[in-house]
Amino acid sequence: MEMVNFIFGIHNHQPLGNFGWVMESAYERSYRPFMETLEEYPNMKVAVHYSGPLLEWIRDNKPEHLDLLRSLVKRGQLEIVVAGFYEPVLASIPKEDRIVQIEKLKEFARNLGYEARGVWLTERVWQPELVKSLRAAGIDYVIVDDYHFMSAGLSKDELFWPYYTEDGGEVITVFPIDEKLRYLIPFRPVDKTLEYLHSLDDGDESKVAVFHDDGEKFGVWPGTYEWVYEKGWLREFFDRVSSDERINLMLYSEYLQRFRPRGLVYLPIASYFEMSEWSLPARQAKLFVEFVEELKKENKFDRYRVFVRGGIWKNFFFKYPESNYMHKRMLMVSKAVRNNPEAREFILRAQCNDAYWHGVFGGVYLPHLRRAVWENIIKAQSHVKTGNFVRDIDFDGRDEVFIENENFYAVFKPAYGGALFELSSKRKAVNYNDVLARRWEHYHEVPEAATPEEGGEGVASIHELGKQIPDEIRRELAYDSHLRAILQDHFLEPETTLDEYRLSRYIELGDFLTGAYNFSLIENGITLERDGSVAKRPARVEKSVRLTEDGFIVDYTVRSDARALFGVELNLAVHSVMEEPAEFEAEKFEVNDPYGIGKVEIELDRRAKVWKYPIKTLSQSESGWDFIQQGVSYTVLFPVEGELRFRLRFREL
């Protein structure tokens, strides 16, 4: 009887820094019931990848789950596939760290009774030079999407076999994941998957269909718990697939013991198809979606899709400069601590991918994920003495000024308003300026909600869920024309209101906010100055900043004959206390964020007007819209009357 080989795999992951209740919910809704159901079907085989952050949580909170995994490995039902332990995008981290990350997860797999030889490529982000790192880590095969192969020129009917690929004389096997199976499982009735697998029968005993996708699809994604468990989809799937005489269930290692890869291919830099949309800048992403929709309307998409390519994963560092800066700080510290095992463990954690990008999940928009990355960067760097230096840290062609004292790291961008773009506390392991700017995203112009195909059978994938922006969010939606920092200098019309200011409906009279400042280093600090214009009249701003043991002191001198308000804005990463817009007068005020940056105090040498408002971004997630407080803006305001001098002190409490 003709049979088709079928490899079924899942990838289970929770980000570093995720909330404990999220981990608990995902465990109860997906990881635990999935494996307990698998235990009931001894003929069912699964290739599984668990990420390090999730395994650490399971080890500390649900150790019985590790016992179940050991039992399933021993019974031959599980093949463990590894990746970087803390789920980095391997292409985005130094080669030296890749091998350490993979070896660390291989060691965990050994403790479960399995010697792993395969890699689940995080977010399937492939670049050819990864071959050498993977082989150096003792990896024989890697799993990517069929889209990678089609981008290399292979047709769909050539994608039911693994292939070799090579770089620099090193060779590795690459398995293609079948995209059609990704959209069938588990969202459509089991019959649809079986029909598709049966249709692949053609007498070639080496032919293999591969499904390998997020384990969270089996219970965590909206609507899937009821469908997969309560309505019995998973039991039916395991029962029918494992007993079907026309389907030969296999593991990756079993396939490679019986068959050789089909030949040699060279894959381009790629990820899965959706990533090529998400990684584009917003306006280009909108055009990309329009183009895809036009091809679909003309029934040309399936035929020409292989030639439709958008951005690559590393584009996120262009799309989100805050992510780029965080990433380049991670690279900087990785290099500095390479010979310090304790410090290096922190930097390996900081390489967890989720906080660096954004697609259908929150990613870079989730403050608690960024906070976890910054915490580990700061803890790693605290093991080495950096000192003061001037260097292009984020590789944008413009120098940053890095200043360190006993308790803080401060990084200024003279070319961008002379502002303070990082103020990291060694004591608290927080970056006070971990604040994301408000951006227009291409999905803010949303289509009508999509519905499942196949006559409404099954449950919608999160890629199919249309979402309408609620009116109460639309009213508060605003976009920034600039990045957020501390000590940003504004010149405003005297009649400007708080609402105009916070909703970006005001006029910036000066060219100081993003203009270039000259600078000189002083003891424990920096002096910055700019000759510019306000309302087309000459103006000058000087600010002298000195780090102190509990924060910083800045002395301002402002000269302008224009009729204007001068404002100094401090954007602080207040995440756990939901603030409301407010206007008040004060000489001193306190900021208290108990589960975030903690308590700080801002003190002036005179009474001033203060504007406060939450910085809220709109992003999509698997559950709908997230209107997230990225931080709070505090702006102290003074009328300018020829010359203005004042002092501001920031104190960590």
From Swiss-Prot:
Protein's UniProt keywords contain Transferase: yes
Catalyzed reactions per annotation: Transfers a segment of a (1->4)-alpha-D-glucan to a new position in an acceptor, which may be glucose or a (1->4)-alpha-D-glucan
Keywords carried by this UniProt record: Carbohydrate metabolism, Glycosyltransferase, Transferase
Coiled-coil boundaries: none
An annotated Gene Ontology molecular function: 4-alpha-glucanotransferase activity
Alphabetized CDD domains for the sequence: GH57N_TLGT_like (cd10793)
Pfam families: AmyA-A_glucT_m, AmyA-gluTrfs_C, Glyco_hydro_57
InterPro entries the UniProt entry points to: A-amylase/a-glucTrfase_C (IPR015179), A-amylase/a-glucTrfase_central (IPR015178), Gal_mutarotase_sf_dom (IPR011013), GH-type_carb-bd (IPR014718), GH57_Enzymes (IPR052046), Glyco_hydro/deAcase_b/a-brl (IPR011330), Glyco_hydro_57/38_cen_sf (IPR028995), Glyco_hydro_57_N (IPR004300)
Catalytic center residues: E123, D214
Xref: Gene3D superfamilies: 2.70.98.10, 3.20.110.20
Transmembrane segment boundaries: none
Enzyme nomenclature, EC number: 2.4.1.25
GO biological process: carbohydrate metabolic process
Similarity field: Belongs to the glycosyl hydrolase 57 family.
Protein name: 4-alpha-glucanotransferase
Organism: Thermococcus kodakarensis (strain ATCC BAA-918 / JCM 12380 / KOD1)
